[in-house]
Curated annotation (Swiss-Prot):
Keyword entries, A-Z: Immunity, Innate immunity, Lysosome, Secreted, Signal
Main localization category: secreted
Protein name: Chitinase domain-containing protein 1
Quaternary assembly: Interacts with STAB1.
UniProt GO MF annotations: chitin binding; oligosaccharide binding
Length: 393
């Protein structure tokens, strides 16, 4: 994989298409503002010839707002679709109102679970809960479940040790979580805890999650778990959550939000989620396809901008991506091995940049993979994507 990217960088560096513009050419280019459609389309992107590998920056800028409003509630993907929304990218709240029927679960990133003392727990972040938005989303998307992410925050190793070794602690934790769900009219939670404990005390963590799931189920609530990739990015090594843990938790949890993104690093720039790695992460977790429908394949709706001279990277969301396309009008390149588009541009101060950001084609390929593997998808996160992405779901 790394050899491929070294060749890729060499090809980019030697490419003649990025020659410096003359002053007159630069003025001509600057005088032409790329157009953006503001109206809806009567056809989805699949019928407009937009899901292609030979993509043009001008096409992305022109079409990205133009989704098919007539089919905004129609589903094209049969598996479960979980979408995350965050307070810091508020466009995601609007997305769920328009496209809510395309999702089975929406997970607002609102809440943190903290341990305050012996058998004392508190769920914080409740000030972010928007009951009006929840009512509006449910009104337009019947059967949609709102399952906020619940992050175990500020837990020390001693906190974990004391809780995981005590049935009373686990019981109080479960009671606290269930009561918050009832009070706030949630349909359950997406629990994020596995990364916090690393590889320590996995047996105790599985026991706690099993108990928590049972308590939620007794209250007719859902229990999902965020899990890291089964294969560590850039290696052939197993990750922190493998087939062994999956086999124990799959019978008791309702779903697993699999983080199949963030593959590349600032020191090794490249795609966000190479397709072969994504496939392998699912196959390692469940080689016999026993619980595949509970796996939610992670799709990133954000990208990465790599400054090659600084070994640095920054996340790219939709608005910045579109602005970069407007400013630089780059040549879009399809990486056939990773099944992702990328482009290069230059800044006077920071030098050469390379951007990997999802496109209609890269997303379609991953949705097809999800269908083939028999899994659902989870999207991080709805406020970061482009509006016409949702025609694919």
């Amino acid at each position: 994989m790394r050899t491929l990217f070294n060749l890729l960088w060499l090809a980019l560096a030697c490419s003649p298409v990025h020659a410096t513009l003359s002053k007159s050419d630069a003025k001509k280019a600057a005088s032409k503002t790329l157009l953006e459609k503001s109206q809806f389309s009567d056809k989805p992107v699949q019928e407009r010839g937009l899901v292609v590998t030979d993509l043009k920056a001008e096409s992305v800028v022109l079409e990205h707002r133009s989704y098919c409003s007539a089919k905004a509630r129609d589903r094209h993907f049969a598996g479960d679709v979980l979408g995350y929304v965050t307070p810091w990218n508020s466009h995601g709240y609007d997305v769920t109102k328009v496209f809510g029927s395309k999702f089975t679960q929406i997970s607002p990133v609102w809440l943190q679970l903290k341990r305050r003392g012996r058998e004392m727990f508190e769920v914080t972040g409740l000030h972010d809960v928007d009951q009006g938005w929840m009512r509006a989303v449910r009104k337009h998307a019947k059967g949609l479940h709102i399952v906020p992410r619940l992050l175990f925050e500020d837990w020390t190793y001693d906190d974990f040790r004391n809780v995981l070794d005590s049935e009373d602690e686990i019981e109080e934790l479960s009671k606290t979580v269930v009561q918050v769900a009832k009070n706030q009219h949630f349909d359950g939670f997406v629990v994020e805890v596995w990364n916090q404990l690393l590889s320590q005390k996995r047996v105790g963590l599985i026991h706690m999650l099993t108990h928590l799931a049972e308590a939620l189920h007794q209250a007719r609530l859902l229990a999902l778990l965020v899990i890291p990739p089964a294969i560590t990015p850039g290696t052939d090594q197993l990750g922190m959550f493998t087939h062994k843990e999956f086999e124990q938790l799959a019978p008791v949890l309702d779903g697993f939000s699999l983080m199949t993104y963030d593959y590349s690093t600032a020191h090794q720039p490249g795609p966000n989620a190479p397709l072969s790695w994504v496939r392998a992460c699912v196959q390692v977790l469940d080689p016999k396809s026993k619980w595949r429908s509970k796996i939610l394949l992670g799709l990133n709706f954000y990208g990465m901008d790599y400054a090659t001279s600084k070994d640095a990277r920054e996340p790219v969301v939709g608005a910045r991506y579109i602005q970069t396309l407007k400013d630089h009008r780059p040549r879009m390149v399809w990486d056939s091995q990773a099944s992702e588009h990328f482009f290069e541009y230059k800044k006077s101060r920071s030098g050469r940049h390379v951007v990997f950001y999802p496109t209609l084609k890269s997303l379609q390929v991953r949705l097809e993979l999800a269908r083939e593997l028999g899994v659902g998808v989870s999207i991080w996160e709805l406020g970061q994507g482009l509006d016409y992405f949702y025609d694919l779901l």
